A protein has these predicted regions:
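Short helix-coil boundary/hinge micro-motifs
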Residues: 1-43, 47
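Short, cationic Gly/His-enriched loop motifs
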Residues: 48-97
Length: 97
């Protein structure tokens, strides 16, 4: 599991996205937006053999913990600005679906 410290070491948060701050391998270049967008519009980041949803890493970066569910307040999965993310239970998260 990725840690908050690793996120700060390898990524820079800007405008709702994470950018590579330190090169991990030959795929992500420094200054480049991390990950790739899936069919729903969520960005998925590969890090040390595991895949993470960008919005979950951003939430962990700012809050220091990972809840079971994270809701995009505006229902836009590609908007991962910290002010658009909130901890939610299953019912709250489903309400926005």
């Amino acid at each position: 599991m990725i840690t908050k410290e690793q996120i700060f070491e390898f990524f820079e948060y800007k405008d709702g996205n994470l950018y590579w701050k330190k090169q991990l391998n030959n795929r992500g270049k420094i200054g480049q937006i991390a990950g790739a967008e899936d069919l729903r519009g969520c960005r998925i980041i590969g890090f040390q053999g595991k895949h993470y949803l960008m919005h979950r890493l951003i939430f962990l970066m700012f809050h220091g913990y990972l809840p079971k569910k994270i809701d995009h307040i505006d229902c836009n999965p590609s908007n991962s600005k910290i002010e658009n993310l909130r901890e939610a239970n299953h019912a709250e998260n489903s309400y926005n679906a």
